[in-house]
Amino acid sequence: MNYSIDIASNTKNVNYGASRLQLKRFDVSKMVDHATIAMIAKRGSGKSWVCRNIMYEKKDIATCTVVSPTEKLNSFYGNFIPPAYIYNRYDSDILSRIYSRQERMFEDNKKREEKGKKPKDDRILLIMDDCMSSKGKWLKDDQILELFFNGRHHHVSFILTMQFSL
């Protein structure tokens, strides 16, 4: 495998045998609001670090909730996310509370706009990092399906990281 980098176009050409793949640098600052992102990569490949980079670029989002079974072992998110917003395992109640919050924010903002006031920022970022150990619990959960299909309408940005595909 060999590669070449074109600095002017921000692309990297990767040759693998007879195949050629052109990769373009992803600019996180241009990512749309309320995105749904799934990262699938092997252990130790930097998925959590990519999440951290996205969090940094989206630091203007006031609320972030993290579900990470490994957090109790490595405190990766604990250095910059308050403990009240970090969960060690998935529970559908987490999403219920997020949806309730978003509904309250929506109603409050509607009232604020009627009064001519500026709406509050209702965006939220949810990260489910390496939650494959509890996939039986969340994979068929209606709350997760709602998030995948309608998260953007709830103003929820969602990042799911996994070591292998479902």
Per-range role (PLM):
Residues 11-31, 52:
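Pre-Walker A adenine-sensing motif
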Residues 65, 76-77:
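A domain-level signal for caspase-like cysteine endopeptidase catalytic cores
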Residues 77-92:
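Active-site regions of enzymes building and remodeling cell-envelope glycoconjugates
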Residues 24-25, 34-62, 69-73, 89-166:
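Conserved P-loop NTPase motor cores
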Residues 1, 5-9:
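Detector for small/aliphatic-rich hydrophobic stretches
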Residues 6, 13, 30, 67, ...:
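Intrinsically disordered, low-complexity eukaryotic regions enriched in glycine, serine
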